[in-house]
């Protein structure tokens, strides 16, 4: 491991310290290493043909006209990407789904876009991780 020196604006350093404290890092170096790993992983997943894993989470209104069946249809259309799906009833109207996906990151992004773009889907978020050799 090597030691490096960086220069940060006071506001950015304060933000880093606040983030480090909230997330329970023992020091700034650990926080910066995790931030860099996250940025590198995100960049790697944007390369065409990259294999990886992803978690797609979203909330949707299960009573919205045909929405549940449209989502299921989209999932079946991309069955080769799906590893597992967790379905949670949040309240009378809303459901949370969490899908674990595996495959080409371009295909995963396309699947996520198809789901998140559905009318009645809210809070859609895709977290991608490149497959490490």
Curated annotation (Swiss-Prot):
Q: Which CDD domains match?
A: RHH_NikR_HicB-like (cd22231)
The keyword DNA-binding is annotated on this UniProt entry? yes
**Assembly:** Homotetramer.
**GO biological-process terms attached to the record:** regulation of DNA-templated transcription; response to nickel cation
- A Pfam entry, by short name: NikR_C
> Per the UniProt entry, what species is this protein from, by scientific name?
Salmonella typhimurium (strain LT2 / SGSC1412 / ATCC 700720)
Per the entry, what this protein does is: Transcriptional repressor of the nikABCDE operon. Is active in the presence of excessive concentrations of intracellular nickel.
Swiss-Prot/TrEMBL cofactor(s): Ni(2+)
Give the top-rank taxon of the lineage listed in the UniProt record for this protein: Bacteria
Q: How is the cofactor bound?
A: Binds 1 nickel ion per subunit.
Family, per the entry? Belongs to the transcriptional regulatory CopG/NikR family.
Protein name per its UniProtKB record: Nickel-responsive regulator
């Amino acid at each position: 491991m090597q030691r490096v020196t960086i220069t940060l604006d006071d506001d950015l350093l304060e933000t880093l310290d606040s983030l480090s404290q909230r997330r329970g890092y023992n020091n700034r170096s650990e926080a910066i290493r995790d931030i860099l790993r996250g940025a590198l992983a995100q960049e790697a997943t944007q390369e065409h043909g990259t294999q990886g894993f992803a978690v797609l989470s979203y909330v949707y209104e299960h009573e919205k006209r045909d929405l549940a069946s449209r989502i299921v249809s989209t999932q079946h259309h991309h069955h080769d990407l799906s590893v597992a799906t967790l379905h949670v009833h949040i309240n009378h109207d809303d459901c949370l789904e969490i899908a674990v996906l595996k495959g080409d990151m371009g295909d995963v992004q396309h699947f996520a876009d198809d789901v998140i773009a559905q009318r009645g889907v809210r809070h859609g978020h895709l977290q991608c991780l490149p497959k490490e050799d």
